[in-house]
Regions:
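CoA-thioester-processing core
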Residues: 121, 125, 135, 141-195, ...
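C-terminal long alpha-helix characteristic of the crotonase
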Residues: 155-161, 203, 212-260, 264, ...
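Acidic, divalent-metal-coordinating active-site segment for phosphoryl/phosphodiester hydrolysis
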Residues: 142, 198-205
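Conserved CoA-thioester-binding segment of acyl-CoA-metabolizing enzymes
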Residues: 2-87, 105, 123
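Glycine- (often His-adjacent) and acidic-residue-rich active-site loop
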Residues: 26, 80, 88-123, 140, ...
Length: 280
């Protein structure tokens, strides 16, 4: 019954077109640090957030974070978005982490507020209503890895991607969810080791540990992880979105509630015997 409902039931979804910004062959055209793109044709339903701050290797500065939050708010309202990919427009880097030069100019109070905003950003990514994929073709350090950890799936270039929570080597500690998400991904003991040492991992090493889903050989263009993320997104597209899936589950469960078999199953569990189902 669930299979039939999943394949036939459709839920109306209001269409609100995305405001696309510069996700073309010239990603710097829009002059923004964060650009939003909705793909078309067979890729319709895939949206991309392009991080493009070459002067600071996509470091998480005030403007960068504000534009990321703005992009997520825009995408969250578009129910046609079925998969969201985070990628970089800066060759050799995904996100270099916190903008320490900018942070050095902040007061202690300002630092506290900004780190709180970073945590909020990662929470927004983790709570995004569609599957999210981080395409790491280059360095993902500190907050950059925390951003990737907030995504559902991670794809990395085998050799050119370098990742790690390196804050302890800077006299800091992970402050945007890394201490929580890394242990949930790898287990407590291994996460502690990586955080305490600030160790950097290649894409191959990260895949071996289970930190990334796929590690792919880099190509001449330097965007192999992005291409694998696109292919993965295309596989996800036919699947029902989470909200509709939960609605389907609710419909199926409601049909089960009044049945005699449901009551028989609970009675059998209570009486420690095998159930005698009658199909009613």
């Amino acid at each position: 019954m669930l299979r039939v409902l999943t394949s036939t039931l459709r839920f109306p979804r209001p269409w609100k077109p995305l405001e696309t910004r510069g996700c073309s062959s010239n990603p710097g055209a829009a002059g923004r640090e964060i650009q939003v793109c909705a793909l078309a044709g067979p890729n319709q339903g895939i949206a991309e957030i392009l991080m493009n701050r070459p002067s600071a290797r996509n470091a998480l500065g005030n403007v960068f974070v504000s534009q990321l939050l703005e992009a997520l708010a825009q995408l969250r309202e578009d129910r046609q978005v079925r998969v969201l990919i985070f990628r970089s427009g800066v060759k050799g880097v995904f996100c270099a982490g916190a903008d320490l030069k900018e942070r050095e100019q902040m007061s202690e109070a300002e630092v506290g507020l900004f780190v709180q905003r970073l945590r909020g950003l990662m929470t927004e990514i983790a709570a995004f209503p569609a599957p999210t994929i981080a395409a790491m073709d280059g360095f993902a350090l500190g907050g950059g890895l925390e951003l990737a950890l907030a995504c559902d799936l991670r794809v990395a270039a085998a050799s050119s991607a370098v990742m790690g929570l390196i804050e302890t080597t800077r006299g800091l500690l992970p402050g945007a969810g890394g201490t929580q998400r890394l242990p949930r991904c790898l287990g407590v003991a291994l996460a502690k080791e990586l955080i305490f040492t600030g160790r950097r991992l290649s894409g191959v090493q990260a895949q071996a540990l289970g930190l990334v889903n796929h590690a792919v050989a880099q190509n001449e263009e330097g965007n192999a992880a992005y291409h694998r993320a696109r292919a993965l997104a295309q596989e996800i597209l036919p699947q029902v979105d989470i909200a509709s899936g939960m609605a389907i589950e609710g419909i199926c469960y409601a049909q089960n509630i009044p049945t005699r078999d449901r009551l028989e199953g609970m009675a059998a569990f209570r009486e420690k015997r095998l159930p005698r189902f009658v199909g009613e």
